[in-house]
């Protein structure tokens, strides 16, 4: 007899889209924290995978809703608080193939992490360790190299394509910027 399981048992190129929070109520609901640009977009990408004891597991989203400031989810087969508590802090993962193709000049934040940032004059500013959304534009959070000539530990560089960001090369994991290394 054929099983009805989907073929995807594990993501080939896993991408974390969020995390499950604490349980809510007694019927297996969980808070969910989304790291997608528009928080609700996390529900557009299915199936979700989680890792339990080093093993990938596919979970099925049954329902979700807003509750006060939180979003809460109900997963299939998670029917009480104890089952929900086992999933607290699990990362919600999808396969990168589920994400939309980007336009030229657009990048997923995850692809910029760890990139080396160098000025157009060749000064090494450090590595991208985080991204911030400021409303007007995204900002690269760059951890400076240990012996930074300017004594700077962290730099915030606006991700303004063309103006500040001159070239992004994901193959060599480098970003060229027009930026004063003294900032």
From Swiss-Prot:
<dbReference type="InterPro" id="IPR009000">
    <property type="entry name" value="Transl_B-barrel_sf"/>
</dbReference>
<dbReference type="Pfam" id="PF01782">
    <property type="entry name" value="RimM"/>
</dbReference>
<comment type="similarity">
    <text>Belongs to the RimM family.</text>
</comment>
<protein>
    <recommendedName>
        <fullName>Ribosome maturation factor RimM</fullName>
    </recommendedName>
</protein>
<dbReference type="InterPro" id="IPR011961">
    <property type="entry name" value="RimM"/>
</dbReference>
<dbReference type="GO" id="GO:0005840">
    <property type="term" value="C:ribosome"/>
</dbReference>
<keyword id="KW-0963">Cytoplasm</keyword>
<dbReference type="InterPro" id="IPR011033">
    <property type="entry name" value="PRC_barrel-like_sf"/>
</dbReference>
<dbReference type="GO" id="GO:0043022">
    <property type="term" value="F:ribosome binding"/>
</dbReference>
<dbReference type="GO" id="GO:0005737">
    <property type="term" value="C:cytoplasm"/>
</dbReference>
<keyword id="KW-0698">rRNA processing</keyword>
<dbReference type="GO" id="GO:0006364">
    <property type="term" value="P:rRNA processing"/>
</dbReference>
<comment type="function">
    <text>An accessory protein needed during the final step in the assembly of 30S ribosomal subunit, possibly for assembly of the head region. Essential for efficient processing of 16S rRNA. May be needed both before and after RbfA during the maturation of 16S rRNA. It has affinity for free ribosomal 30S subunits but not for 70S ribosomes.</text>
</comment>
<dbReference type="InterPro" id="IPR056792">
    <property type="entry name" value="PRC_RimM"/>
</dbReference>
<keyword id="KW-0690">Ribosome biogenesis</keyword>
<dbReference type="GO" id="GO:0042274">
    <property type="term" value="P:ribosomal small subunit biogenesis"/>
</dbReference>
<dbReference type="Pfam" id="PF24986">
    <property type="entry name" value="PRC_RimM"/>
</dbReference>
<dbReference type="InterPro" id="IPR002676">
    <property type="entry name" value="RimM_N"/>
</dbReference>
<feature type="domain" description="PRC barrel">
    <location>
        <begin position="104"/>
        <end position="183"/>
    </location>
</feature>
<dbReference type="InterPro" id="IPR036976">
    <property type="entry name" value="RimM_N_sf"/>
</dbReference>
<keyword id="KW-0143">Chaperone</keyword>
<comment type="subunit">
    <text>Binds ribosomal protein uS19.</text>
</comment>
């Amino acid at each position: 007899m054929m099983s009805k399981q989907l073929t995807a048992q594990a993501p080939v190129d896993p991408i974390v889209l969020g995390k499950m929070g604490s349980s809510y109520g007694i019927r297996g609901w969980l808070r969910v924290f989304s790291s997608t640009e528009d928080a609700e977009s996390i529900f557009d990408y299915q199936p979700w995978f989680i890792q339990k004891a080093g093993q990938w597991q596919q979970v099925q989203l049954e329902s979700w809703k807003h509750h006060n400031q939180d979003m809460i989810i109900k997963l299939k087969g998670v029917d009480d608080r104890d089952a929900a508590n086992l999933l607290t802090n699990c990362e919600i993962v999808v396969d990168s193939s589920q994400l939309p193709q980007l336009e030229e000049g657009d990048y997923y934040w995850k692809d910029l992490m760890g990139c080396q940032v160098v000025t157009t004059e060749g000064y090494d500013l450090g590595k991208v360790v985080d991204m911030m959304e400021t409303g007007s534009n995204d900002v690269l959070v760059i951890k400076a190299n240990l012996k930074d000539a300017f004594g700077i530990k962290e730099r915030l560089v606006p991700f303004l394509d063309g103006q500040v960001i001159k070239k992004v090369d994901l193959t060599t994991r480098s970003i060229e910027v027009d930026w004063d290394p003294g900032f």
